[in-house]
């Protein structure tokens, strides 16, 4: 956690179920959302993704914020959440996936997780008020 603090990270979105980073981050003043997620290749609920997106977008509203999204290996869960965050920021899904893969080449976008993000984005769009309303 010291390394993250030295890199200027202010917020951690922790997707690993194995361990809560909160106690390690507190002495460094880093805010943590522990959003424990099994890497079980089962569909993930939109509520799980929304919780992470809410935390990320609130963090990114702060001009000096640096957000770090992670899981245990950085292969499935963190990329899924990063994809949800970027889509919530109006990125096209395919472009977001390309960016994530460019930054983290070991990413494996499991179909079930990508579909979970698609469902989340779709439900988000349905719940947002339309400009004509």
PLM regions with names:
Residues 1-66, 87-121, 125:
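Cysteine-based protein phosphatase catalytic domain of the PTP/DSP
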Residues 64-83:
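A phosphate-binding catalytic loop at a beta-strand-loop-alpha-helix junction
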Residues 113, 132-133:
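Structured catalytic cores of enzymes that bind and process phosphorylated ligands/cofactors
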């Amino acid at each position: 956690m010291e390394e993250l603090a030295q890199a200027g990270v202010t917020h951690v979105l922790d997707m690993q179920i194995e361990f809560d980073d909160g106690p390690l981050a507190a002495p460094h003043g880093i805010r943590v959302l522990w959003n424990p997620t099994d890497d079980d290749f089962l569909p993930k609920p939109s509520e799980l993704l929304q919780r992470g997106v809410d935390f990320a977008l609130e963090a990114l509203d702060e001009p000096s914020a640096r957000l770090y999204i992670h899981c245990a290996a950085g292969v499935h869960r963190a990329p899924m959440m990063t994809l949800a965050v970027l889509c919530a920021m109006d990125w096209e899904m395919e472009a977001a996936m390309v960016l994530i893969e460019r930054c983290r080449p070991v990413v494996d976008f499991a179909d079930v997780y990508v579909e979970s993000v698609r469902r989340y984005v779709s439900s988000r769009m349905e719940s947002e008020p339309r400009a004509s309303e």
